[in-house]
């Protein structure tokens, strides 16, 4: 059995390079980071947790592709992935290039986890909802 780590990485948490080193040193197989381009200030969509308020971490997530590139640069074996990338909110050509570049630069260790997302307000800002 293989175990991995998923984390909402923000400007208030451990940095991508430090986290990736720690995850690999402790024998985990993978590191996955989620994606949110932004959280609209005015929202109608309830949090997926069922809580009244959205957790602060959703408002402060780092870009997973940039953070995973940092992680790739300081690790050798760690599988790196998006958990998940919100592909409906992204330009497909730019995304394909980012994914291919990250996979190449990581030595084939990138896993492209994709999904649609839950935040209707965020989707609307991208012209998707």
Model-assigned labels for residue ranges:
Residues 58-61, 74, 80, 119-126:
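Glycine-rich, flexible loop/turn motifs
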């Amino acid at each position: 059995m293989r175990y991995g780590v998923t984390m909402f990485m923000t400007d208030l948490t451990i940095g991508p390079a430090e986290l990736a080193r720690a995850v690999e040193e402790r024998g985990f197989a993978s590191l996955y980071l989620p994606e949110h381009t932004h959280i609209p200030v005015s929202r109608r969509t309830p949090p997926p947790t069922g809580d009244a308020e959205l957790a602060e971490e959703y408002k402060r997530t780092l870009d997973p592709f940039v953070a995973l590139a940092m992680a790739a640069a300081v690790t050798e074996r760690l599988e790196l992935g998006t958990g998940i990338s919100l592909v409906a909110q992204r330009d497909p050509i730019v995304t394909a290039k980012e994914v291919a570049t990250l996979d190449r630069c990581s030595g084939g260790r990138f896993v492209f986890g994709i999904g649609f997302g839950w935040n209707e307000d965020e989707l609307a800002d991208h012209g998707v909802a």
